[in-house]
């Protein structure tokens, strides 16, 4: 057997560089690169190995570990989980800075490989700089924090362990059902330790993403339920986009059987916004058409959806409809006593359609779906078409969204909007028009503030030919903005629109909706410090990080600035002041947020009555 004598870190990087996959029919590297922030825990071992393979496996430098992980996650999401990236950090704070991002990937079922440095296996210099000492278990390090938010975790305490750990890691990262973050903790001394590895271990490999076929019996049961339905609705989740050919299969199924399609946050863009069977967004952030149809349906066909509370209205939206859940993951397919069909979305929809033959939804239901959907599109057009406001009135997010899309004639097909948290996810879910799969990039599983700008970098790396528009509130911007400098450094140009409502406007409105007084969310409601402070010049801040930037004060000025931003050669930030109170009133659904059972406040007591009414509507 021919062997190669390599350090553990050299073998690791060489193996990753040898992994390939198919993307749009082309063979490409499975790992597009490694994000790295070096410290004493990884610079000598992993850092040396990355330098040796810098051409085959590019290394990217960031300014914050959580942010670079979010960029990696967004890259994988933009590639519909068919390609991915790795992230390496030092031990201690570098490693734990990844934990929030690991949870983001875990919730969203997105692949990313974490390679944090770890403490010495030998324990000779124990405790080392930044080591977290556990008083009860000598084997615990900071990296044990990854275990609850990793789909697979391994600590490599001997170089030979890579021979089993790496194939397991690849298997999890590319498994459609188990897909999620993988963590390989790399002790500092073992990174540098040499071993005679079999040369065959590093042979180029083509990793194929499986498309599990559905069980015939499950298909028969689902088909029987559908044939008995008169008022069905499809709920398209992220699994439709992650399935190769899933969006096309969804369209063909809907057209063949005349079933309206509602989209979750993760599934939005699976069907073009103007398709006749597009009912629009569903759930708490949904529109009136999809929610009306979902509430009145006698059967819900959920395809690739986690059926989270925002999709189901905390399980109050679907009424008494039967639920058929198509999902590659049994954990998701069996939720809420659904009739489960385990399988890839594209394969399952095609097989289910073949069993249904000429069946279609009832004619009265088809007509109702068309009426509701047409009415919703008219509502959206009225909101996003607003160009002039009274001089004393600030714009709100819906009007800003309209301005963004008006500044490119093919925005629905050309732009990719990126967002994650705050007021914007609800407004974008309702109002953004996407004509191609992937044109709507919303991280709304973990809804992690700070994902937006870093995520935009990952999306731009995946799709350099498209305009990536990051829409972010002032709250999320202040959480994590350092990667503006990274985008300038890497040449990954973004158009960033900052909507400044001077605080956490979304949670302020929720606070008021549950009966409480405004408190500690908007700057004006903070009880500590001088009222109204601080006064933040976001445009000046963005310029200091290397971007082009300007502040505008009207929708007309915003459109002009966005034209300049689209024509610019580097990241361009446009800031506009927005109303923290106004939102799109059309649509929406009840969302369970616990309201105090007893309170001295009459408004809280009134909110409790509304809460109890919502509880009575929940499915049991």
Predicted regions and their residues:
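Conserved structured core elements
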Residues: 6, 10, 28, 216, ...
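Active-site diphosphate/adenylate-binding microenvironment
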Residues: 34-46, 373-454, 459
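Glycine-rich beta-strand-to-loop/alpha-helix junction loops that act as flexible
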Residues: 236-239, 303, 420-421, 472-475
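Thiamine diphosphate
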Residues: 123-136, 333-334, 341-342, 349-350, ...
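Phosphate/pyrophosphate-binding active-site segments
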Residues: 157-160, 198, 319-320, 324-421, ...
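N-terminal alpha/beta PP-like core and its mobile active-site loop of ThDP/TPP-dependent enzymes
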Residues: 2-359, 403, 493-496, 537, ...
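A structural motif corresponding to the C-terminal end of an alpha-helix
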Residues: 149, 403-411, 542-547
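Active-site nucleophile and cofactor-binding loops and adjacent substrate-binding regions
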Residues: 35-40, 59-70, 87-94, 157-158, ...
């Amino acid at each position: 057997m021919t062997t190669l004598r390599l350090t553990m870190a050299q073998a690791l990087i060489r193996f990753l560089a040898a992994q390939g996959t198919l993307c749009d029919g082309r063979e490409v590297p499975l790992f597009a690169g490694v994000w790295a922030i070096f410290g004493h825990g990884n610079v000598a071992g992993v850092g040396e190995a990355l330098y040796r393979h810098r051409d085959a496996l590019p290394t990217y430098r960031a300014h914050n570990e959580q942010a670079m992980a979010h960029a990696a996650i967004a890259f994988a999401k933009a590639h519909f989980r068919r390609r991915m990236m790795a992230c390496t950090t030092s031990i201690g704070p570098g490693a734990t800075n990844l934990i929030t991002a690991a949870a983001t990937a875990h919730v969203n079922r997105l692949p990313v490989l974490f390679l944090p440095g770890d403490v010495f296996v030998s324990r000779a210099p124990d405790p080392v700089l930044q080591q977290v000492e556990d008083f009860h278990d000598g084997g615990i390090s900071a990296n044990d924090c990854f275990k609850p938010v990793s789909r697979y975790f391994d600590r490599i305490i001997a170089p030979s362990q890579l021979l089993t750990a790496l194939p397991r890691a690849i298997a999890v990262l590319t498994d459609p059902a188990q897909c999620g973050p993988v963590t390989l903790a790399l002790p500092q001394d073992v990174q540098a330790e040499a071993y005679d590895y079999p040369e065959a271990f590093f042979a180029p490999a083509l990793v194929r993403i499986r498309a599990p076929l559905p069980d015939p019996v499950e298909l028969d049961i689902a088909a029987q339920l559908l044939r008995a339905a008169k008022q069905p609705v499809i709920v398209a989740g992220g699994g439709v986009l992650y399935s190769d050919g899933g969006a096309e299969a969804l369209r063909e199924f809907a057209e063949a059987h005349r079933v309206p399609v509602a989209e979750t946050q993760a599934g939005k863009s699976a069907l073009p916004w103007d398709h006749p069977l597009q009912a629009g967004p569903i759930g708490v952030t949904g529109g009136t058409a999809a929610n009306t149809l979902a509430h009145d349906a006698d059967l819900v066909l959920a395809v690739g959806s986690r059926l989270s509370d925002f999709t189901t209205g905390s399980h109050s939206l679907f009424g008494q409809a039967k639920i058929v859940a198509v999902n590659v993951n049994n954990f998701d397919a069996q939720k809420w006593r659904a009739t489960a069909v385990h399988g890839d979305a594209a394969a399952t929809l095609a097989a289910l359609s073949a069993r249904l033959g000429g069946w279609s939804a009832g004619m009265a239901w088809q007509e109702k779906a068309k009426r509701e959907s047409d009415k919703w599109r008219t509502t959206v057009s009225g909101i996003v078409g607003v160009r002039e406001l009274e001089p004393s009135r600030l714009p709100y997010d819906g009007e800003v969204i309209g301005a963004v899309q008006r500044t490119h004639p093919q925005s629905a097909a050309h732009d990719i909007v990126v967002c994650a948290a705050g007021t914007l996810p609800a407004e974008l879910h309702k109002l953004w028009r996407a004509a191609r799969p992937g044109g709507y990039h919303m991280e709304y599983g973990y809804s992690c503030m700070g994902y937006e700008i870093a995520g935009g970098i990952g999306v731009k790396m995946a799709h350099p030919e498209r305009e990536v528009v990051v829409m972010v509130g002032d709250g999320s911007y202040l959480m994590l903005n350092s990667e503006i400098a990274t985008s300038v450094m890497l040449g990954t140009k973004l158009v960033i629109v900052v909507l400044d409502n001077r605080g956490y406007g979304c949670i302020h409105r929720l606070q008021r909706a549950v009966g409480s007084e405004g408190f500690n969310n908007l700057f004006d409601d903070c009880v500590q410090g001088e009222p109204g402070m601080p006064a933040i010049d976001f445009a000046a801040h963005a310029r200091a990080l290397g971007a082009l930037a300007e502040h505008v004060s009207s929708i007309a000025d915003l459109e002009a600035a966005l034209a300049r931003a689209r024509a610019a050669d580097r990241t361009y930030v446009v800031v506009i002041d927005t109303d923290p109170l106004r939102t799109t009133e059309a649509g929406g659904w009840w969302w369970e947020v616990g309201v105090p059972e007893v309170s001295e406040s009459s408004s809280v007591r009134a909110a409790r009555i509304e809460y109890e009414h919502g509880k009575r509507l929940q499915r049991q």
